[in-house]
Amino acid sequence: MAMLQTNLGFITSPTFLCPKLKVKLNSYLWFSYRSQVQKLDFSKRVNRSYKRDALLLSIKCSSSTGFDNSNVVVKEKSVSVILLAGGQGKRMKMSMPKQYIPLLGQPIALYSFFTFSRMPEVKEIVVVCDPFFRDIFEEYEESIDVDLRFAIPGKERQDSVYSGLQEIDVNSELVCIHDSARPLVNTEDVEKVLKDGSAVGAAVLGVPAKATIKEVNSDSLVVKTLDRKTLWEMQTPQVIKPELLKKGFELVKSEGLEVTDDVSIVEYLKHPVYVSQGSYTNIKVTTPDDLLLAERILSEDS
């Protein structure tokens, strides 16, 4: 296993070809690091007839399970996925946004992209990203069975979600919002939150808090210890009926409210939000340590 130090940090891969620093991945995929490692570009020399095989081989952890219509949990082709891929990833301390950093040879954002693309419930994926990185997703447009659209990211998360919401199909029955920096979400959990979102109107994946959490004041003094049994850590996807999300955005915009996640928009409407229990492996990759943990989880799964 070779190791290369670049602006992205240390990257491991079976093969490196100099001087263009092309990294050979799996059997078919190649990454090119160009323009001082500012953009990740797929080589056009990849034979398109192999892309489906490469896709299936590269995402075993999250979407290798086959699907048939009997497993559809909501109406087929009724879900619009908004994949948030416009963050800067400053905590990763790398020159490239975290969602495009290779994770075992594949950009982080592509893991969940492929997972959603193989679900029969999904009609389309709206990728909210800088146009500079669109070709990473466009390379697979002919190999997936969903529509692919794009939206421009906003200044804050809620602005990016709103931008993506403007691009969804008007006939979609559910909006499924996901952070592309969570590559390890599995199909079973997605199906669970889709079903709950359809039933309640809004649902979010979450896991019970494992750590002791204390409320602390501005002087760094403990105010009280919170009851861990009532605390859950929120994840994504977060699933909301589009008419409910649009109504929530109207309220947020009219009152100048700021929210840190999507179901918070619905909470302002006093509408119930269901928490679907997810998996602790559905981590958000925001630091180098997270990247190492994700690699370990993927390696163990394979």
UniProtKB/Swiss-Prot annotation:
EC nos: 2.7.7.60
UniProt-listed Pfam families: IspD (PF01128)
UniProt note: phenotype after gene disruption: Albino phenotype and seedling lethal when homozygous. The phenotype is caused by an early arrest in chloroplast differentiation.
GO BP, sorted A to Z: isopentenyl diphosphate biosynthetic process, methylerythritol 4-phosphate pathway
Keywords from the named record: Acetylation, Chloroplast, Isoprene biosynthesis, Nucleotidyltransferase, Plastid, Transferase, Transit peptide
Chain positions found as N-acetylserine: 62
Subcellular location: Plastid, Chloroplast stroma
Induction of its expression: Circadian-regulated with a peak in the late period of the light phase.
Annotated tissue distribution: Expressed in leaves, stems and flowers, but not in roots.
Pathway(s) where this gene product acts: Isoprenoid biosynthesis; isopentenyl diphosphate biosynthesis via DXP pathway; isopentenyl diphosphate from 1-deoxy-D-xylulose 5-phosphate: step 2/6
Root EC class: transferase
Bound cofactor: record note: Divalent metal cations. Mg(2+), Ni(2+) and Mn(2+) are the most effective. Co(2+) and Ca(2+) are only minimally effective.
Residues marked Positions MEP for the nucleophilic attack (site): 228, 284
Transit peptide start-stop: 1-61
Obligatory cofactor(s): Mg(2+); Ni(2+); Mn(2+)
Catalyzed reactions: 2-C-methyl-D-erythritol 4-phosphate + CTP + H(+) = 4-CDP-2-C-methyl-D-erythritol + diphosphate
TM helices/strands, residue ranges: none
SUPFAM superfamilies in the record: Nucleotide-diphospho-sugar transferases (SSF53448)
The protein's role, per its UniProt record: Enzyme of the plastid non-mevalonate pathway for isoprenoid biosynthesis that catalyzes the formation of 4-diphosphocytidyl-2-C-methyl-D-erythritol from CTP and 2-C-methyl-D-erythritol 4-phosphate (MEP). Is essential for chloroplast development and required for pigments and gibberellins biosynthesis.
Name of the protein in question: 2-C-methyl-D-erythritol 4-phosphate cytidylyltransferase, chloroplastic
Gene: ISPD
